[in-house]
Amino acid sequence: NILILISVLFANILFVNIQSIIKHQILYSTFPMRLRWRFHNLLLKQSLDFFHNDFAGRLSAKVMQTALAIREFWIILGDMLAYVSIYFITVSIVLGAISPTLLIPLMVWLGLFLLSAWFFIPRLSKVSQQQADARAVMTGRVTDAYTNIQTVKLFAHAGRESQYAKASMKEFMTTVYAQMRLGTLFEVSINLLSAVLFVGVIGTAVWLWTQGLAALGVIAATTAMILKLNSMAEFMMWHMSALFENVGTIQDGMQTLGKKINIQDKPDAKPLTVKQGEIVFKDVTFAYNNKNVIDHFNLHIKAGEKIGIVGRSGAGKSTLIQLLLHFYHLKEGAILIDGQNIEDVTQDSLRANIALVTQDTSLLHRSVAENIKYGRPDATDLDMQSAVHKAKAAEFIPQLVDLKGRSGYEAQVGERGVKLSGGQRQRIAIARVFLKDAPILILDEATSALDSEVEAAIQSSLNDLMVDKTVIAIAHRLSTIAQMDRLIVLDEGRIAEQGTHEELIAKNGIYAQLWKRQTGGFLIEQKVV
């Protein structure tokens, strides 16, 4: 018996030390950060549609809390295994060595303990899933208000946003109350079982003593072991609850983080090679919410050709650009660049060969230099400064100063570039495109945020940028694209007219009507119902 006890003692010491090394050197250090990085990397591969259907704050919360929950799961599981091996197994061996009869109440208690856990733990896990989702929604609403703080202030809706966030906090607390009720009932049941265990084992030990089957010291030793086992039972109860609460959090997080990536490179996808820049839309059909937005669309853009796309709101102009960038899958047809189907090439290589300036420019919350070099991270400072001068941004960048005193190219632009004016953001975006120098250029209202004087100054630079490039320009201000090689007029996802500005005016069709309705150079849009 002594040899058995010594062996158990050394085995416990070895197991506890191994568990401690794993917990402190792996789980507490790099493990959660690696998980966050993997989850973040996974989300970055998701399609635009995935992000359009969720809160940015909610997704951030999922990344953070799921990684922590996985870490806590393994830490708690390790602690539970250590305690079970040290106390329960040791106590069972010792009691069995004294008398196998002492194991009877212990086994009955274990069965009742597992039955209680079987009842409460799945319910705690379900509540934890609801709680994790409620926490993510709460975080998403708070983050949404901060991200759009200018809109909140503009409409004087601070109180409304406060109540909106408070409603999600109430929903979160509802799950907390449910969790606490279940936890309390679980604890009460374990305390009752602990009393049953104490009475059962001590009563059995006393009976053995009265029968002359055990010494009086056995009662004292048994009492000490059972009291320790009772404290272990409470420890196990809380840790089992926490374990399955983390399981619920993990399950909830993986419902979001584990979603299938809709737009993926094919296994045999090759990098896109653009030598000329010819673009062909071949019988393209795209549906959104079961409605064809682009319907059997055919367009051949020659290498180096500059075309303008015109149409009322909802005609499908921006959708064409998103399809060209492979943000969505086509329902039918194909899009070819220099004869290569964009669905057969890698997404990164496709977008590396296309430069885009949109009307709603947002910048990263980083320095001016980092935002400009986002177009070509390996660019030199001289290359960057050259692009800045071409974009007519050199006049205001040296004047920029942030709250920490960083100035010029090192100044932080704020979240989405909120510290800059619309025109300044647009010029930095244009500088970024100059630096990227891609063979295909897309201008989606590229100068809409600029005043007439700056627009006139930058137009010559844009003309220089267009040289030897295939250009697609979308504009509501028709005067900015009237000189394009060809104008494409879209209507309900189809080409209604095409030709030069003069040819379309002579046709007296949709384009001519849009031209006539301009006021001061701006198009009065008519939305398609």
Task: Set out the residue ranges of the language-model regions.
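Transmembrane-helix motif of ABC transporter permease domains
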Residues: 1-28, 32, 52, 104-109, ...
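Transmembrane alpha-helical core residues of multi-pass small-molecule transporters
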Residues: 8, 12, 79, 83, ...
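Membrane-embedded alpha-helical segments of multi-pass transporters/permeases
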Residues: 14-18, 88, 92, 96, ...
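Membrane-spanning helices that line or support transport/gating and their immediate boundary helices
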Residues: 18-22, 26, 30, 123-130, ...
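Short intracellular "coupling" helices and adjacent cytoplasmic loop segments at the cytosolic face
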Residues: 29, 37-67, 141-164, 239, ...
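An intracellular "coupling" helix at the cytosolic face of ABC transporter transmembrane type-1 domains
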Residues: 48-49, 65-78, 82, 86, ...
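Helix-loop-helix
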Residues: 94-111, 182-251, 256-257
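ABC-type nucleotide-binding domain
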Residues: 265-266, 272-529
